[in-house]
């Protein structure tokens, strides 16, 4: 077990699931929970602590009331934000959650300027941008969990097409966390073979569509919520890479500085994760078609950022 402390701000379905996995798997020494509803964080801390009595975990989990309590966290996960409500426009949701994330980042900056920040709040790419712009944090220390989840969903749909065989599936998805994401077919393999060697074009096209709609499908089925197990596990993979300084490659939302031909825009791209957060952005040689799709994805994120610049930061 790492002698590390992880803070989770926002203890809804994703935050509480994440805390449960961290605690019961002995991934860190301490977990701090904070929610706008204090009773929620207290309840989750108690419930998870009691569940741990049936495990070999020694992790301590604590509900926090004060932002100062996060001063010693090595990693802070931000899941705070509201879901879109009936009659609420996407612009209203964007501004509302930007206010929440900016407020959280202001508190973190005052109390812990050294932690690695992982954003899960939606709209993801815009919230990563908000966190960066509203704080004095180094760019490599703020990243978003998105592409890792999208890649996991793509892997699932490939396995589904193949009948769930015991094979090694690797996938890569770049771009914004939404309908404009770009699943990279040429960089996705099954036991080292390219997808078009094991699946038909029709099957691959279907996988791309299902990957883009993966989150929406779950929202539709749940009716009053969204996915939380897969997002939590994707975040766990990122946390372990940072805590253990593995230098493994993950698709994460980060701010670009000339990579792929774009600057000062947040998008999901392959990165090397280690103890310092985003240690390197990997530029893949993508096709002209994928470049066009990536450009469309970037423009979609830019639209949201322009709304923030004109109605929130201005």
Curated annotation (Swiss-Prot):
Record-linked SUPFAM superfamilies: LDH C-terminal domain-like (SSF56327), NAD(P)-binding Rossmann-fold domains (SSF51735)
EC number(s) reported in the record: 1.1.1.37
A GO term, aspect molecular function: L-malate dehydrogenase (NAD+) activity
Top-level taxonomy: Bacteria, Pseudomonadati, Campylobacterota, Epsilonproteobacteria, Campylobacterales
UniProt-listed GO biological process terms: carboxylic acid metabolic process; tricarboxylic acid cycle
Active-site residues, Swiss-Prot/TrEMBL: 177
Job of this protein: Catalyzes the reversible oxidation of malate to oxaloacetate.
Positions that bind substrate: 84, 90, 122, 153
Gene3D superfamilies in the cross-refs: Lactate dehydrogenase/glycoside hydrolase, family 4, C-terminal (3.90.110.10), NAD(P)-binding Rossmann-like Domain (3.40.50.720)
Name under which the protein is recorded: Malate dehydrogenase
Keywords associated with the record: NAD, Oxidoreductase, Tricarboxylic acid cycle
Recorded catalytic activity of this chain's protein: (S)-malate + NAD(+) = oxaloacetate + NADH + H(+)
Enzyme type, top EC level: oxidoreductase
Residues given in the record as NAD(+) binding sites: 9-15, 97, 120-122
Annotated family: Belongs to the LDH/MDH superfamily.
Organism listed in the record: Aliarcobacter butzleri (strain RM4018)
């Amino acid at each position: 077990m790492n002698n590390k402390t992880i803070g989770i701000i926002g203890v809804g379905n994703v935050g509480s699931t994440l805390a449960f996995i961290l605690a019961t798997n002995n991934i860190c020494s301490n977990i701090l929970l904070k929610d706008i509803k204090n009773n929620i964080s207290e309840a989750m801390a108690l419930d998870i602590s009691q569940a741990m009595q049936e495990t070999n975990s020694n992790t301590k989990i604590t509900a926090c009331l004060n932002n100062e309590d996060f001063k010693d966290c090595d990693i802070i996960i931000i899941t705070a934000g509201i879901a879109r409500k009936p009659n609420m426009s996407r612009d209203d949701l964007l501004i509302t959650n930007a206010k929440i994330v900016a407020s959280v980042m202001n508190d973190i900056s005052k109390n812990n300027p050294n932690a690695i920040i992982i954003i899960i709040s939606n709209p993801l790419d815009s919230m990563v941008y908000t966190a960066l712009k509203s704080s004095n944090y180094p760019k490599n220390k703020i990243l978003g969990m998105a592409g890792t989840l999208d890649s996991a969903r793509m892997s699932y749909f490939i396995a589904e097409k193949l009948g769930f065989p015991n094979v090694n599936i690797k996938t890569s998805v770049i771009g914004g966390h939404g309908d404009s994401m770009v699943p990279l077919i040429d960089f996705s393999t099954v036991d080292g073979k390219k997808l078009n060697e094991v699946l038909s074009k029709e099957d691959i096209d279907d996988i791309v569509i299902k990957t883009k709609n993966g989150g929406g499908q779950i929202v539709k089925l749940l009716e009053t919520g969204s996915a939380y197990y897969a997002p939590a596990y994707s975040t766990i993979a990122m946390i372990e890479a940072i805590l253990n300084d593995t230098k493994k490659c993950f698709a994460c939302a980060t701010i670009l500085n000339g990579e792929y031909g774009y600057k000062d825009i947040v998008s999901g791209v392959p990165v090397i994760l280690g103890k310092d957060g985003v240690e390197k952005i990997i530029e893949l040689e993508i096709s002209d078609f994928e470049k066009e799709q990536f450009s469309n994805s970037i423009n979609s994120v830019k639209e949201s950022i322009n709304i923030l610049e004109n109605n929130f930061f201005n």
